[in-house]
Amino acid sequence: MRMPQRQGTRGAPRSRSQSLPPPVGGLNARDSLANMKPEDAITLDNWIPTATQVEIRNGYTSHATFTGDCETVIVYNGLAATKIFVAVDATADAIIDATSGGAVSTPVVGGTGPTVQAITNPQFDYVNFGTAGGQFLSLVNGANTPLEYDGTTWSAASITHASLTSSNLFTNAVYAERLWFGEKNTFNLYYLPVRTKSGASTQLNIGSLFKLGGSLSNILTVTDAADSLTDYIAFVSTEGEVIAYTGTDPASASTWARAAHFIIGRPVCKGQRAWCKFGADAFLTTVDGIISLRAAIASDRAENAAGITGKIRRLVSDDVTAHGARFGWALVLHPAGQKLILNVPTAENSASRQYV
């Protein structure tokens, strides 16, 4: 007698485990999930990717406390000592020595006195610069007389030119053993004699070379990729136009030449906070993300924008749209921690987020 064939019974569902590598590829806001590599992440808050693993973000230790908002941390690197100052937005803006830490309140510049001179803008650009007389700080803020510090004493810096009101100097840089300064809302540059921290300056107007208009935004320095002994100084406009020079003396055609002229995305802010040195290169924060100046010289805008921050370019672009007008954008290199940090001010002087 034939028996009907039994239909196979389904077994119980079985789970399968699958291992994924740690997200060492970092945050990815560029690719779709289907095309994303398994080592990338769509959310990566307070985790830092390394070559082989991800590490949780470290906490922080309070170094100094004071009244007001710190708008510039100023570091003096002397021959024998390092000192830390904070430029504070308070009832009476001031620069305070925070080297020793703890509760600090005595102004070394500004304050209610004021000491040395009054400060109406605590947002400084500064450089460390050496002369035969020692190591100095040179500071400008586009609102007050420039300042200098010799490791012991703060004083007003005398930077003169017949066409210059020195309080209009908003950024500075060191190139070819000279101090360079930019005048706000112009394309006027001023430079001092070699190994000189103050005194009579020479004006260099480069406005006729910029085809997109605007005004000076940043002064950067970079070293040639093929010749490590060749340095360049680059001037960036508010429209993202870059003109680079090489040489040592702008007053001599034989020792000063235009080396490059190209377009990048507009810088997110003026002055030094938008850029930082990275080895022989210089990185600049723009509406296209963080770009390499050396790469920008040799590639087009789209190719360069896909480089350093290619995976988070959309996030940075969205942040520029939402927060671009706020003070607090900054690009900071942390060599000891092997990190490059982009600070985005989501609420001025009170909240921010950082891409690392």
Regions inferred by a protein language model and the residue ranges of each:
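N-terminal beta-propeller domains
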Residues: 1-108, 168-245, 328-330, 335-356
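Short alpha-helical segments and helix-capping/turn motifs at coil-helix boundaries
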Residues: 70-71, 78-79, 121-135, 159-177, ...
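Helix-rich alpha-solenoid scaffolding regions
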Residues: 108-120, 132, 136-139, 276, ...
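Internal, well-ordered domain-core segments that constitute the primary functional module
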Residues: 135-184, 188
